[in-house]
Swiss-Prot record:
Family the UniProt entry places it in: Belongs to the archaeal N-glycosylase/DNA lyase (AGOG) family.
Catalytic activity: 2'-deoxyribonucleotide-(2'-deoxyribose 5'-phosphate)-2'-deoxyribonucleotide-DNA = a 3'-end 2'-deoxyribonucleotide-(2,3-dehydro-2,3-deoxyribose 5'-phosphate)-DNA + a 5'-end 5'-phospho-2'-deoxyribonucleoside-DNA + H(+)
Organism of derivation: Nanoarchaeum equitans (strain Kin4-M)
EC number assigned by the record: 3.2.2.-, 4.2.99.18
Origin superkingdom: Archaea
Free-text note regarding domains: Contains two alpha-helical subdomains, with the 8-oxoguanine binding site located in a cleft at their interface. Contains a helix-hairpin-helix (HhH) structural motif and a Gly/Pro-rich sequence followed by a conserved Asp (HhH-GPD motif).
Lineage start: Archaea, Nanobdellota, Candidatus Nanoarchaeia, Nanoarchaeales, Nanoarchaeaceae
InterPro entries: AGOG, AGOG-like, DNA_glycosylase
Protein name: N-glycosylase/DNA lyase
């Protein structure tokens, strides 16, 4: 018997995920309104955990208030204070590499798998860790906000496994399997699932996905 989520997601495509990302994801819309250097966006993504507010609101505030690395220090102290010492240490670890990424942003946009590995190495983490792969997603959003054309996410990069996705299935291998069966990269699957409860007047296939997720 076919997995019900796979059956529903087979009705979608990368183009559907692209539509959601460009038109409905408030994190991208915030960066589109106030584009930022990609290194600064990655730095914020690396500390985007244990937030005290919805992620959409956090990124909207970031886009409005942060224009430099020094701004980010002040911002995290005020708006992202949980585990503050750990987050400040993560910023310090990343800081020496921010210019390297900025100078090579086009290379990394063409080779997001390489950026995935580079971030994991410098942060001493696994390439599948949630903050690492989420940073890739936000890096791509930052590039699009700067005017670069859309590039699909690579199939090799994992989905950011947060509590909502863990309710469906906590095993990353399951999500790679879903990706393979639906021909949608994991980060684009995240885009289809993550904002689904905030979309009104849903087309039928989105409504089916929302109904399935609501009943879990």
């Amino acid at each position: 018997m076919e997995d019900p989520l796979i059956k529903i997601l087979k009705q979608f495509s990368i183009e559907d995920a692209k539509y959601v990302e460009y038109n409905l994801d408030r994190q991208f819309l915030a960066l589109k309104e106030n584009p930022k250097p990609v290194g600064l966006v990655i730095a914020n993504a690396l500390i985007s955990y244990q937030l005290t507010m919805p992620g959409e609101r956090y990124w909207e505030l970031f886009a409005k208030k942060v224009n430099s690395f020094n701004d980010l220090y002040d911002f995290v102290k005020k708006y992202n204070p949980r585990f503050l010492s750990n987050k400040l240490k993560r910023l310090e670890r990343f800081k020496p590499y921010i210019d390297i990424i900025e100078q090579n942003r086009e290379h990394y946009y063409e080779n997001m798998v390489a950026l995935n590995k580079f971030l994991a190495k410098i942060m001493n983490q696994n390439i599948y860790d949630k903050t690492i792969v989420f940073s890739i997603k936000m890096f791509a959003y930052a590039m699009r906000a700067l005017g670069y054309k859309f590039k699909p996410f690579p199939f090799e990069i994992a989905i950011p496994l947060d509590y909502r996705l863990k309710k469906i299935n906590p095993d990353l291998n399951y999500w790679f399997y879903v990706s393979k069966q639906t021909n949608i990269p994991p980060l684009h699957i995240d885009s289809l699932i993550w904002p689904i409860f905030r979309i009104k007047n849903l087309p039928k296939k989105f409504a089916l996905l929302k109904e399935y997720l609501s009943n879990l």
